[in-house]
Amino acid sequence: MSKAHKSWPHRRRNQFSSQRSLKKEMNFFQQQPPPFGTVPPQMTFPPNWQGVEKDPAFLTKDFNLLTLNNQPLPGNTSQPRAKGPENNLHNQYEQKVRPYIDLIDSLRALGVEQDLALPAIAVIGDQSSGKSSVLEALSGVALPRGSGIVTRCPLVLKLKKQPYKAWAGRISYQNTEIELQDPGQVEKEIHKAQNVMAGNGLGISHELISLEITSPEVPDLTIIDLPGIARVAVGNQPRDIGLQIKALIKRYIQRQQTINLVVVPCNVDIATTEALSMAHEVDPEGDRTIGILTKPDLMDRGTEKSIINVVRNLTYPLKKGYMIVKCRGQQEIINRLSLAEATKKEITFFQTHPCFRVLLEEGSATVPRLAERLTAELITHIQKSLPLLEEQIRESHQKATEELRRCGADIPSQDADKMFFLIEKIKMFNQDIEKLIEGEEVVRENETRLYNKIREDFKNWIGILATNTQKVKNIIHEEVEKYEKQYRGKELLGFVNYKTFETIVHQYIQHLVEPALSMLQKAVEIIRQAFVNMAKKHFGEFFNLNHTVQSKIEDIKVRHTEKAENMIQLQFRMEQIVFCQDQIYSVVVKKVREEIFNPLGKPSQNMKLNSHFPINESSVSSFNEIGVHLNAYFSETSTRLANQIPFIIQYFMLRENGDSLQKAMMQILQEKNRYSWLLQEQSETATKRRMLKERIYRLTQARHALCQFSSKEIH
């Protein structure tokens, strides 16, 4: 478990104690004459979400005082506004609720969402589902509306309640930021932003538009509006516009950090809506999906019962349940009905409706209740997500820092600095080459050191020597018999002809030349690849420098391969001279005799290698005698070659080759007029380094923001 996870319960305990004290204050306020806008005492919350996740303790029943337009809900229309308690409640609210939303908004403003998902509420719905009307009612501003695709870019709607301050807005996209002085500017500026980002047509863009609204008449809420789901392309729309929109929506709603707000009109079959189907696909248990029913005034008479069942979570269950709202209709928009008046009409609609009045009493209806509910859900969601978010930011920061380290430092602009930069690069490369030569290079878990790779070929060389020796043993009888028939002169039986012995030795030696040279070529390729990989590691981002080093590796390899090959050929030419020190040879011959004639340490009873010449126990045939000498000499020669050939390969291809490469690298520093050319960097590397620096900056700022937030929570 991370430190962030371990420390969080302590913060939460502190937080809950503050919430309990706040709850006592709320109880005091509720004992006073109800202030303007409070709900009637008999109002209860719908069971479909009350029992699943309780609201944070600091979101009290007086919460609607702080939401839309300060409109009163039914049951309390005449009381004067209690400014004292409301102001105190707002201060407590600002201390406990607003910081969570501000924290996530600040992280989103830093661009942290490019690196990891942040807690959010995303609004999805089919075209003409009433999605824009719901957002208008929440924000108090007119958003783009009409037929077809209206929302063409994700819109982050940041609502911040500021009592006693004038309305203010700001829209941001790409490198543009525009201050808005009037709500009437919003729709025009969003249209303009969408045209810049998605083109003057009907295409879509994945880039975000940020709309921030500060007003005394909005709830504290951040919500992401996504394009409406289109089933078929019309007009000049791309033929795959439906797939594009679904891919964009899925990118947001599949994140575990996102609460999905699914808008469904009452006059359609809820089970067939594409939006709810997409939400179910990414959230099959309905843990983070809230259903919003719209247009209750357009449904057929007599079907109200089915809608009540949906809102009560009896038809298509969601753990977070449903809400129902009535926003401005098209005719009301044409008649310029204000949003404030629309909210009043909505409350009147539910209050006077014979079937839906019960939903109002249960707290499942009206936009003000929806605003309250969404803020509570968002705050709870943020609280749950913060420990994991801290850990993700820490891990992402660490990973980006490591990637930046591998990219290396920026290339200096001054010639003198370029020289020092190049010296450092070559120095590090030479140090790693030296480690390869000495068998001390650092390797990862599944990698093997260079020496071990070569050693495998050296082991195979011992097997080749043993196999060749066995072949000679098998042809001894044939060779001696050939001599007896063709070349024997006046020698008596049993006398070994030295020429026969020497001929067999020469053949044996000659058969080893090709395997030895083959082993050399394998070792050369292994070493060359190791040097090339090291060059890519150090100079891969500098294509000219890397090409120069690769050429030097190849040239030096060819030169030293030729030297090693010549030395191996010389070694085998020397092996044509049959020689061994008497003291050494006599010991080996004695040992071989014992192994052949007395392998178990017992006197030999019968040694007959040729039935044509029966011999007694005291005599030794020419076959046995020449076999003894060949075995003895081959044993000594194999021991010598088993070490000598690997010595030659290591000396020329590792030590000499590596040393020559290091010297050649230092010679590059003499070419001062080529520094700029050598240090030309691949554009991808420069771009990657810049992006990593930006990511590290974002994540550093995010860690700082989380640290400050956590310290405030603790204190």
Swiss-Prot record:
Swiss-Prot/TrEMBL keywords? Antiviral defense, Cytoplasm, GTP-binding, Immunity, Innate immunity, Nucleotide-binding, Nucleus
The Dynamin-type G domain, residue ranges = 115-387
Q: Where is the GED domain?
A: 623-714
Region labeled Disordered — which residues? 1-24, 69-88
Q: Where in the cell is it found?
A: Cytoplasm; Nucleus
For region G3 motif, the annotated ranges are: 225-228
Q: One cellular component GO annotation, for this chain's record?
A: presynapse
Residues binding GTP are 125-132, 225-229, 294-297
Q: Where is this region: G2 motif?
A: 150-152
Region annotation (G1 motif) ranges? 125-132
Biological role: Interferon-induced dynamin-like GTPase with antiviral activity.
- Protein name stated in the entry: Interferon-induced GTP-binding protein Mx2
Q: Which organism is it from?
A: Macaca mulatta (Rhesus macaque)
